[in-house]
């Protein structure tokens, strides 16, 4: 469905400054940190592996702050791209752009400011990291528009969410070795899987509005496809562990992560909206388990 088929986005109501700041906070998902955590864990995986343990503190700060800034910017540009669609979807109709509490122009300014602050932080790192930030910006800004043209926006999200991995290796080592790309591939598979849970929540609305997703592409084979994605993710992480020479702590972390993923399938086995969303949220613990495995393995060397 084209945006001409949608009703106009409401005019912004009169708000006090505290109310307006609250709407900006909602716009950047400050009230929902799950997205930042899903972006943070693979970034920390990369930094710890690149440094062989605790990375330089300034580098850790830049990437941790950058995770929040870029994820927030990604949420803003996503809502801007979907401002015609969100008022018609139950889960998104209360977003600030959908209600008109924040205008499209305001949202673009928020996006620009967030990305400029993130870029300013990156400028304190080496030239390779700065150069890699440019395709990272393109990935973050273009992702929201993919759902109109392909059933694979979740794959693209994985590419965008994982770009901190090659950047992290570049910042610590001054290069991006094969290990970084193996980890990046694992993250793409992971993000595609967990965002498919998320897409399963919106599948009926997306079908009605003409949006595309892996949940729609997989159809009744969605749980099988999810199993394949998670299996490939763990296969890639096995290669990461072997190449990095990680110890038993890492393999224990992977084992715990696998059990957590199995529980996600139990939760979402009936494909209901609420359980699918819980399965999506549950991936925070998967990322944490893998990080603890990496950090413990490196600390015990």
Curated annotation (Swiss-Prot):
Known cofactor(s): Mg(2+)
Any Pfam family matching the protein: UbiA
UniProt keyword Lipid biosynthesis present: no
GO cellular component, one term: plasma membrane
Pathway: Cofactor biosynthesis; ubiquinone biosynthesis
Domain of life: Bacteria
EC number: 2.5.1.39
Compartments in which it is found: Cell inner membrane
This protein's record includes keyword Magnesium: yes
Membrane-crossing segments per the record: 34-54, 57-77, 108-128, 163-183, 222-242, 248-268, 280-300
Class of enzymatic activity (EC top level): transferase
Record membrane topology: Multi-pass membrane protein
Main location: membrane
GO MF assignments: 4-hydroxybenzoate polyprenyltransferase activity
NCBIfam families associated with the record: ubiA_proteo (TIGR01474)
HAMAP family: UbiA
Job of this protein: Catalyzes the prenylation of para-hydroxybenzoate (PHB) with an all-trans polyprenyl group. Mediates the second step in the final reaction sequence of ubiquinone-8 (UQ-8) biosynthesis, which is the condensation of the polyisoprenoid side chain with PHB, generating the first membrane-bound Q intermediate 3-octaprenyl-4-hydroxybenzoate.
Protein family per UniProt: Belongs to the UbiA prenyltransferase family.
Protein name: 4-hydroxybenzoate octaprenyltransferase
Organism whose genome encodes this protein: Xanthomonas campestris pv. campestris (strain ATCC 33913 / DSM 3586 / NCPPB 528 / LMG 568 / P 25)
Encoding gene, per UniProt annotation: ubiA
């Amino acid at each position: 469905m084209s945006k001409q088929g949608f009703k106009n986005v409401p005019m912004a109501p009169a708000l006090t400054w505290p109310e307006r700041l609250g709407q900006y906070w909602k716009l950047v998902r400050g009230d929902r940190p799950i997205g930042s955590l899903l972006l943070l864990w693979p970034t920390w995986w990369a930094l710890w592996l690149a440094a062989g343990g605790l990375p330089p503190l300034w580098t850790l700060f830049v990437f941790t702050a950058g995770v929040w800034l870029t994820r927030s910017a990604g949420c803003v540009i996503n809502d801007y791209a979907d401002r015609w669609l969100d008022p018609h979807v139950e889960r998104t109709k209360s977003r600030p752009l959908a209600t008109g509490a924040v205008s499209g122009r305001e949202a673009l300014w928020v996006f620009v400011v967030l990305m400029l602050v993130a870029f300013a932080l990156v400028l304190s790192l080496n030239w390779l990291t700065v150069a890699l930030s440019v395709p990272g910006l393109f990935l973050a800004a273009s992702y929201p528009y993919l759902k109109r043209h392909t059933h694979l926006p979740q794959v693209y999200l994985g590419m965008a969410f994982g770009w901190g991995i090659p950047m992290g290796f570049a910042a610590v080592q001054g290069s991006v070795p094969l290990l970084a790309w193996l980890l990046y591939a694992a993250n793409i598979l992971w993000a595609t899987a967990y965002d498919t849970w998320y897409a399963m929540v919106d599948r009926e609305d997306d079908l009605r509005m003409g949006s595309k997703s892996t949940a729609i592409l997989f159809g009744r084979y969605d749980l099988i496809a999810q199993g394949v994605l998670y299996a490939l993710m763990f296969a890639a992480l096995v290669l990461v562990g072997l190449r990095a020479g990680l110890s038993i702590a890492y393999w224990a972390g992977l084992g715990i992560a696998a059990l957590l993923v199995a529980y996600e399938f139990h939760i979402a086995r009936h494909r209901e909206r609420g359980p699918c969303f819980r399965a999506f949220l549950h991936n925070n613990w998967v990322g944490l388990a893998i990080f603890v495995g990496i950090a413990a393995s490196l600390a015990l060397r």
